[in-house]
Every structure is written in structure tokens, then in C-alpha cells.
Amino acid sequence: VEKKELMKKQEQLIKDAFSIFNGGKGLDHWSYSSTSTPFAKNIIGYSFPQEVRRTFPFRYKANFGNLVNNTVQKLIGHEIWKTSTMKEEKWEKDFNKIFQTELGIINEKPPVDDKDKFAKEKMVEYAIDCVNVTEKVVKDIVKDDKLICEYHVRKKEMTMIKDILGKVDYLTKKIFIELKTKPPNIRKVKNKEEWTMSTQPLPTEPTTDNLTQTSFYYMCTKKIPYLIYVNDKEHIIFDQTHELMKKDHLEFLYYKMVDKILLWERMIMFCKGSLSELAQMCEPPDMYHPFYYKDLAPEQEKLITNLWGIKQQQ
């Protein structure tokens, strides 16, 4: 009985501490993307309820990856997972229909500004080419094996309180692929109110961020990992022949991520549900970061001022 009481008490403490997330609803899980940034950035995103987060502005680059990946998955996937327990029943297989539907979802949200409006229209031709590049490279690796897309994986280490949840882009019985699309860049034309778009070059080495995400899927699936970058012209494949993709290095990166989450969880538990105390424990947001704190919603700007006393530079 005592053990039961203790567990109940502990559960309540956890619930109280994590109530800083999702407008009081708490946190169901960590994800790679939620833990890959500084804690301050996590707080000013995930402390808001989901319906509020959905209204936050984000530019064409995030949309580009979804447009390409979702289209390719529907074109060549044999199974697509909707949730961790539910697969898609059936889906459109015709390229034009898939692409237009995906584009429609993106365009439901108004562009952030004129520059973004231009980019969202112009990116379409780049996305079509990028779909072709992606489809080909995935097919070359998967060959005739059954291809599973968006497979949900969860994992929890040591004394972690919350699981890490992720979705694997492409999975077969032997391999998995983490696919990174490099969206085109947009630049202002000198002395004019116009913009131009150009292909973003592919990296020559895999980035630590992307390797860490790959390491999580590797630890969950134990399959042969591939990290692939694509743009509208070409692709580059990193597999286990690459020094940084070897088992030891992936494990090292995975446990580094776990350590970071364990630290965050200790801080959260220590602050017992006080967001302002937690904010004082972590480094204030670096407002000059090239992209972390651009395009903030008014609610987020207000929260930053409340928690850290930082006023927005206009």
C-alpha cells in the first residue's frame, strides 16, 4: 500500500512540474525536434497549447520539406502510419492529385509577408523537381522491399520521465532512411522590392543535428541507417561507410541527447511547475540567432519579455 501511495505522490509531482507545457495540459513526450534547440526556445514554443502553436507563423522552408516528403511517401510507400497504432487505410497514388492536395494544406495558412508569399509560389517548381530526385534515391536503396513510412517509435532511457517519440521517414525490414530536403534559398534583388530563388547546395558532411536524429531512429530500429540530403537537382547519401555514421558514433550522439533530456527533466522537477523559475535556470534566448527567434508570434514576444525582461528589437 505504501509503495502505491508513494507512486501516486510521485505521479502528482510529475504532473504538477510538467504542467508548464501545453497550456497546463502537460507533456506527453519529448521529440528530437523539441530537444535539439536551447531550452529557452523549447519553452517559448511548447508552453503554449497546441491550438495556439498552430497559429504561429512559419515560413516556406518548413513547408517545402513536408510537401516533398509527404508526396514521395504517398507515391511509393506500401504502408503509411497515421498514429502509433493506426495506419492510413488508403490514399491517392496519382502525383498531380497528391501534390495539389499537399499544396492546398500549406496554402490554407496565409504567408508571413510579401517575401514569403513570393517564396511559397516560386518554391512549387523546385518542389516538383525535388520529389523526382527523392523518389529515385529512395527507390534505389529500398529496391523491391516493402516500404513503411512515418513509422512511430518511442524510447526511454535510465531514469527518464517521458519517452522520446519520433517518426521514421522510410523503413524496410533491413534499413531506414532519414531524409533531409534542402529547400531553395530566397534573396532580395539589390535596390528593388523583388526576390530571387536559387537551389540550396547540399552539405558535404552530415550535420550533428541530423546525425543525432538518425541516431535516435537507429537505437529504436537497430536497422542499417541512411541519412540522405536532397535538393531539386541532386542528392548525397551518408551510410555506415562514413566515419560519423558508424554504430559507436551514433550511440555516442544518442546518449548525449539523453543526457540533455535528463538534465531538462531535473530542472523541470526542481521548479515544481513554476515557469518563471525555470526560465531563470536556463540561458536567456539569444535574440540575434539567425533563425531561432525570428517571426515570433505576439504571444511569444510577450512571454519572452515576461520571463527574461527582453524587449523585442524592431
Residues covered by each model-derived region:
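Metal-dependent nuclease catalytic regions and adjoining charged, substrate-binding loops involved
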Residues: M219-Q314
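A structural signal for short, well-ordered beta-strand segments and their strand-loop junctions
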Residues: I148, L171-L179, P225-Y229
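Active-site metal-coordination segments of metallo-dependent hydrolases
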Residues: R59-A62, L202-L211
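Conserved catalytic cores of phosphodiester-cleaving nucleases, focusing on short active-site segments
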Residues: V68, I164-Q200, Y217
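Short, solvent-exposed loop/turn segments at secondary-structure junctions
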Residues: R154-K156, K182-P184, N231-H235
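An active-site-proximal "capping" alpha-helix that borders the catalytic cofactor pocket
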Residues: N210-T221
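Metal-dependent nuclease catalytic cores that hydrolyze phosphodiester bonds in DNA/RNA
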Residues: V1-K167
